[in-house]
């Protein structure tokens, strides 16, 4: 299992969406898992805002636990 680099990682909108889909969650479901609002997930995915601080770290931890790795531009099989 590839480790996700936590420190200094900046999550982009398409990565957040890919992680959510990898987990099989809706925006509401991911928001519940992270303790945030569905609107926040939507804003991250559309690029209006980027996750910062604790949210950034939580996304990396969830990704690592789920065995998720992603490169920009990657398509789902």
Please report, for each region that a protein language model flagged, where it lies by residue.
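Short, amphipathic alpha-helical "recognition" segments used to contact nucleic acids or chromatin
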Residues: 10-22
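Key DNA-contacting residues within the recognition helix of helix-turn-helix
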Residues: 17, 42-43, 52, 60
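DNA major-groove recognition helix of helix-turn-helix/homeodomain DNA-binding modules
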Residues: 2, 52-72
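A detector for short, charged/polar N-terminal pre-domain segments
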Residues: 1-11
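Residue-level detection of the helix-turn-helix DNA-binding "recognition helix"
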Residues: 21, 35, 46, 64
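Short alpha-helical DNA-recognition segment
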Residues: 24-43
């Amino acid at each position: 299992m590839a480790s996700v680099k936590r420190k200094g990682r900046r999550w982009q909108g398409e990565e957040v969406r890919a992680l959510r889909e990898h987990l099989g969650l809706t925006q509401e479901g991911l928001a519940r898992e992270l303790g945030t609002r569905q609107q926040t997930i939507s804003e991250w995915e559309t690029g209006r805002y980027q996750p910062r601080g604790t949210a950034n770290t939580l996304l990396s931890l969830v990704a690592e636990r789920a065995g998720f790795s992603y490169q920009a531009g990657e398509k789902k099989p």
